[in-house]
């Protein structure tokens, strides 16, 4: 009898994309993008199972050919997190297990980031975790770069597109604010993932367009893990060349 599984990695992969239709199937070094994400994720020793979650038969067929476990989900979901929840339900994930939402457009993801992300769950009180990295004052000016401020216990106080914390007197003698940029990788206890999908979109979530604020507004703490690793997502077709170079550098 096999040991019970306690940590699942789920990769949401939608075919539809306004900026890059069919992105999960984009070829990178002879393989579709989703395969590279799966290959990186399965190198994380914490996972008992890694699976793709898709609404598209073309992606599912390609996954089957390559031997990538795949779960078919409904076509329409409010967010990738909702798709991950449906896949976790179909996989029969127990309430106390950890589910990691692995972005499907991160083919150069460093598996060590995933190890860091799931480490806090050794503490039974942790329900949700995410990652953050140091930001310069210049990087923090962009509203596309989400910032997070963290309490002394390591839990998130707030996420914002604004430059937080605001340094009233300016960064005299250098960047002294200790700004942190949020990395959009999340790990949930299954019960917290279910709770998230049951909650309606919150006021601050709709204002900032940041779904993690739904958790904070409803009293669900998010543990923030600092990392020195950076992500390199694919938003547009022209990003593929950058990823190819990164993969060749890292794996060559």
Swiss-Prot record:
One term of GO molecular function: 3-deoxy-manno-octulosonate cytidylyltransferase activity
InterPro entries to which the protein is assigned, alphabetical: Cytidylyl_trans, KdsB, Nucleotide-diphossugar_trans
Gene Ontology cellular-component annotations: cytosol
Enzyme class, spelled out: transferase
Localization of this protein: Cytoplasm
One Pfam family linked to the record: CTP_transf_3
Gene Ontology BP annotations: CMP-keto-3-deoxy-D-manno-octulosonic acid biosynthetic process; lipopolysaccharide biosynthetic process
EC number: 2.7.7.38
Catalytic reactions of this protein: 3-deoxy-alpha-D-manno-oct-2-ulosonate + CTP = CMP-3-deoxy-beta-D-manno-octulosonate + diphosphate
Keywords of this entry: Cytoplasm, Lipopolysaccharide biosynthesis, Nucleotidyltransferase, Transferase
Keyword ATP-binding recorded: no
Annotated signal peptide: none
Pathway: Nucleotide-sugar biosynthesis; CMP-3-deoxy-D-manno-octulosonate biosynthesis; CMP-3-deoxy-D-manno-octulosonate from 3-deoxy-D-manno-octulosonate and CTP: step 1/1; Bacterial outer membrane biogenesis; lipopolysaccharide biosynthesis
Primary location: cytoplasm
Family stated for the protein in its record: Belongs to the KdsB family.
Record's function text: Activates KDO (a required 8-carbon sugar) for incorporation into bacterial lipopolysaccharide in Gram-negative bacteria.
Full protein name: 3-deoxy-manno-octulosonate cytidylyltransferase
Organism field: Nitratidesulfovibrio vulgaris (strain ATCC 29579 / DSM 644 / CCUG 34227 / NCIMB 8303 / VKM B-1760 / Hildenborough)
